[in-house]
From Swiss-Prot:
One Gene Ontology biological process: DNA replication
Keyword annotations from UniProtKB, A to Z: ATP-binding, DNA replication, Nucleotide-binding
GO MF annotation terms: ATP binding; ATP hydrolysis activity
Taxonomic lineage: Archaea, Methanobacteriati, Methanobacteriota, Stenosarchaea group, Halobacteria
Biological role stated in the UniProt entry: Involved in regulation of DNA replication.
Gene that specifies this protein: orc8
Protein name per the record: ORC1-type DNA replication protein 8
Phenotype caused by lack of the gene: Not essential for normal growth.
Family, similarity comment: Belongs to the CDC6/cdc18 family.
Length: 397
């Protein structure tokens, strides 16, 4: 049978090294952040109660990778030292479990993963789920670090962030100790927590800045050595991938995606060398993929608000104020038989879309006569947004 598949081109030695799931054994260009993390967690290996830690930074700057590296290092160090209690770390992504109740169930089931206990299911009361979580923590008779990735996705219910740090004080655990490690893309996340939760957390903060071009070159050199066959890259490919990613968001993920797609372009053209022209072709592919993936993660009304800005941009009417955009948004919602949200909610969506990189936000101040307000314009390609929303599962536009 004749098939449409090509013979394998030996440009990749190990393509998985350039995939999202790959976790490097050694973390590059994050020594300062690792030192801050070690200082924040030093009490654990010294035998004291751990501090809560919150980690902030944009997507792709190493927050989750460094956190996992530090959890592994901490568990190893605790095992290696005499007189130090065992350390257990458990991670849950709050994007997939966006309420305290769902996150608590997921934590229980992660902790039960290596036991004979049955997993929890929904339907239990909140107090029963919390008691099950405290029981699992107490059963470890050591230090348990609860890692909540994308913690800014937790809804307005602060229950878990209030209960975990107070577990020992409230008598929910006795022979163990627990701390929360929160990872967030949103630097203002803490401000949205209730005052009692802010007072309870008393956390240490670690901020991850975007990578610069030189740091991204180091990271790409390391990945390329493991992922690619010798001599397949022309000299300017890695610097170009690094420069483009640094200029955009400073994301290692973006730089690695550009490198991988550049190699794919060369393979599809049946060439044995990757050039800077291949990088230019890869840029649009990566951007389209990023936009498509990010739009899938938006709520339905988040997509409607983004589409409203996109349509306004196509009409050459941006930057636009939120109150002027609202009518466009309401028409889109009505088109899909959905009741529009309040103007305040739309304003919140606009702020979120700005933080995610879809929009550019302008602060206008015209004094007493004109007032102060924000205007918004699209910061990504309008056609890509339309195509991505058209493909999204929960909004076909």
């Amino acid at each position: 049978m004749k098939t449409p598949f090509r013979d394998r081109v030996e440009l990749f030695a190990n393509k998985d090294v350039l995939k999202d799931h790959y976790e490097p054994e050694e973390i590059r260009e994050r020594d300062e952040e690792i030192d801050q993390y070690a200082n924040a967690l030093q009490d654990v290996v010294d035998g004291w109660e751990p501090d809560n830690v919150f980690v902030y930074g944009k997507t792709g700057v190493g927050k989750t990778a460094v956190t996992r590296y530090m959890m592994d290092a901490l568990e190893y160090e605790a095992d290696d030292r005499d007189g130090v209690d065992s350390v257990t770390s458990v991670e849950v992504n709050c994007h997939h479990h966006p309420s305290s109740y769902q996150a608590a169930i997921a934590l229980v089931n992660e902790l039960r993963g290596d036991t004979d206990s049955d997993p929890l299911t929904t339907g239990l009361s909140t107090s029963d789920v919390l008691n099950a979580l405290f029981d699992e923590i107490e059963a470890r008779e050591g230090t348990v670090l609860i890692v909540l990735d994308e913690i800014d996705n937790l809804d307005d219910d602060d229950m878990l962030l209030y209960q975990l740090p107070r577990a020992k004080t409230n008598g929910n655990i006795e022979d163990s100790q627990v701390a929360v490690v929160g990872i967030s893309n949103d630097y203002t996340f803490r401000n949205d927590l209730s005052p009692k939760v802010q007072d309870t957390l008393c956390e240490r903060e670690i901020k991850f800045p975007p990578y610069d071009a030189n740091e991204l070159v180091t990271i790409l050199d390391d990945r390329a050595e493991r992922a690619l066959s010798s001599g397949v890259l022309t000299g300017g490919v890695i610097p170009q991938c690094a420069a483009l990613a640094a200029r955009d968001r400073g994301s290692a993920r973006q730089a690695i995606d550009l490198l991988r797609e550049s190699v794919n372009v060369a393979i599809e053209d049946e060439r044995e060398t990757v050039t800077e022209d291949d990088v230019e072709t890869a840029v649009r592919r990566v951007e389209r993929g990023r936009i498509k993936d990010s739009i899938k993660d938006l709520t339905t009304h988040g997509q409607y608000v983004l589409l409203a800005v996109t349509q306004t941009a196509i009409a050459d009417d941006t930057p636009v104020r939120a109150k002027e955009l609202y009518e466009v948004y309401a028409d889109i919602a009505a088109e899909y038989a959905s009741d529009p949200l309040s103007q305040r909610s739309v304003h919140d969506h606009l702020n979120d879309l700005s933080m995610l990189g879809f929009l550019r936000q302008h602060d206008r101040n015209y004094g007493r006569g004109g007032g102060q307000f924000f205007e918004y314009e699209l910061d990504v390609d309008a056609t890509m947004v339309q195509e991505a929303i058209a493909d999204a599962d929960d909004a076909t536009v």
